[in-house]
Amino acid sequence: MINITAAWIGFLLGCISGAVPGLFFYGYDWLGGYTSWPRRLIRLAHISFFGIGFLNLGLGLTGNVLGVESPIASILMLGGAIAMPTVCYASAFRPAFRHLFFIPAGSVTAAIVLFIASVGGASCSVQDEHGTLSSPLHTQVEL
């Protein structure tokens, strides 16, 4: 699923978006100081790469394990992964962009709701070496 790839790209961008500003964080007054609006929004953008990355990873892996596909949820989650840091960075330097936070927040929320709905009827089973299907929660593992 594309969401797994998007998750790892998000993790990479999270590392980069933390490392670059990290070169300047030692300056007490950098971007107006630690509690300034621009600095807080840059931190939020940085952490959003990881947070929404984990949501993408969860959606992709859960979908694979359960054999569930929810293309609309997938697209909405990808949209949220792109829109959230974009709105954060835009808002950091043009505060009027803060009014656009409903787009990534709504996108991610809708993705989760749709994915939960698609998982509702799914069942997960594991095939053993003899071809017998069983629930993974009731599978005995020999050590």
What positions do the PLM features span?
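Polytopic transmembrane helical bundles with strong interfacial aromatic enrichment
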Residues: 1-46, 50-143
